[in-house]
Amino acid sequence: MPAPHGGILQDLIARDALKKNELLSEAQSSDILVWNLTPRQLCDIELILNGGFSPLTGFLNENDYSSVVTDSRLADGTLWTIPITLDVDEAFANQIKPDTRIALFQDDEIPIAILTVQDVYKPNKTIEAEKVFRGDPEHPAISYLFNVAGDYYVGGSLEAIQLPQHYDYPGLRKTPAQLRLEFQSRQWDRVVAFQTRNPMHRAHRELTVRAAREANAKVLIHPVVGLTKPGDIDHHTRVRVYQEIIKRYPNGIAFLSLLPLAMRMSGDREAVWHAIIRKNYGASHFIVGRDHAGPGKNSKGVDFYGPYDAQELVESYKHELDIEVVPFRMVTYLPDEDRYAPIDQIDTTKTRTLNISGTELRRRLRVGGEIPEWFSYPEVVKILRESNPPRPKQGFSIVLGNSLTVSREQLSIALLSTFLQFGGGRYYKIFEHNNKTELLSLIQDFIGSGSGLIIPNQWEDDKDSVVGKQNVYLLDTSSSADIQLESADEPISHIVQKVVLFLEDNGFFVF
């Protein structure tokens, strides 16, 4: 088992356990400055406090930040590729001076740690975007950097009170110290870690088992359950999948643990970061995938990263990382032999192969299409179908646009009456909302349960509009409407017909 990065596992929870009560009292005092941690900061601080980000013991000061951005190293020369920063707004930054102590809270209620400030600085975000994320403004991390993150960073050391509170899967959330003890108790000194933010299927099981056998090692399934790429499948669905698929491994070869990481999708730099984290968790080997941690393509169809950039950068640091890199070897299904094999060992001009892309899988889930057993296990498909029901079982919402001149009440009643005659498999409701933005979540709950909503009035403030949310469709005369009317005073019967045909075309009704 490799030593932690930097030589010492920086478990701040264990280090500060004896002064926890003292720190708790300080955090709850009325005269201490308080910062409520953002979702990304909560992920980052958990991995600082539990040692997953060893050798870090706090958020980066300006010297360390600048060195990481430009040279992929901390100021002392230690390899570190991603800046871990506490971003705040200008108003909060103006309250801070060196040596200020700040209580860091989760959800404004749970004290997590106290930060002793070393410095407050305004980063050059343009340089950070270019050096760390290669500068494409469409990169999700660059969008976050300029549109979400605060304009000032606070550097300083942390004293731990407790880890962020999670109410799901407590038995699967092993800290680095706990996972290292688990490996020791099992006498696993060689462990291949597998990083994923997606559901796993038979090909993933095959490639991880092959990697373990080639390395004479065991397998750590170590999925990210913090922040991933926008649009990814939710972690609850994925964890249920992982819990099922791990049963398909040979007995005693695999272990599942969840990683509360906020991914940056920064490709090659992130792959090095992932390797460091897995070393801290006790893994001796790490599978680096094709286009590892890349966000795919931009709107022009150009890849943000090359397919092998990550593998090449991690390999270039292998002597410093002290963890063996296992290149991801894509496997494909051979239907004539009913087995999987590495695609680089197959002559595809002579051997028939089958594969289902992620896009095709999502399409089949959406329309209720067949997902063959050679691709995924039945229990995995069942979980995915429960979380991604086909369109006839999904809910929807029809928002009546502001330009309509027909009676909204009568149109709503006409739509409701028409929908009800199609059968009782879906709940319908006319939803008058009275400009209450907090009802947005309620609308999504109705849609998520497979119901059909009719919303006679939009919110006046566009930022609070439901239009544009998943399965929410605007009925209006505007060119941006999902269901476009030729005129504001079309007869109600014509409008109802257009709505029904639209919903049928999009799979909500099957006649």
UniProtKB/Swiss-Prot annotation:
Q: Which residues bind sulfate?
A: 195, 197, 293
| Stretch list, region N-terminal | 1-167
Q: Which reaction does this chain catalyze?
A: sulfate + ATP + H(+) = adenosine 5'-phosphosulfate + diphosphate
**Listed pathway(s):** Sulfur metabolism; hydrogen sulfide biosynthesis; sulfite from sulfate: step 1/3
Region: Required for oligomerization, residue numbers: 394-511
Q: Relate the induction remark in this record.
A: Expression depends on the formation of the MET4-MET28-MET31 and MET4-MET28-MET32 complexes on its 5' upstream region.
| Enzyme Commission number, as recorded | 2.7.7.4
Annotated residues for binding of ATP: 195-198, 289-292, 331
- InterPro entries, alphabetized: ATP-Sase_PUA-like_dom, P-loop_NTPase, PUA-like_sf, Rossmann-like_a/b/a_fold, Sulf_adenylyltr_euk, Sulf_AdTrans/APS_kinase, Sulfurylase_cat_dom, Sulphate_adenylyltransferase
Q: What else is known?
A: Present with 1510 molecules/cell in log phase SD medium.
- The record's note on its domains: The oligomerization domain is distantly related to APS kinases, but it is not functional and does not bind APS. It is required for oligomerization of the enzyme, although the oligomerization state has no effect on the catalytic activity of the enzyme.
State what this protein does.
Catalyzes the first intracellular reaction of sulfate assimilation, forming adenosine-5'-phosphosulfate (APS) from inorganic sulfate and ATP. Plays an important role in sulfate activation as a component of the biosynthesis pathway of sulfur-containing amino acids.
Its assembly, as annotated, is: Homohexamer. Dimer of trimers.
HAMAP family found in the cross-reference section = Sulf_adenylyltr_euk
**Name of protein:** Sulfate adenylyltransferase
Source species: Saccharomyces cerevisiae (strain ATCC 204508 / S288c) (Baker's yeast)
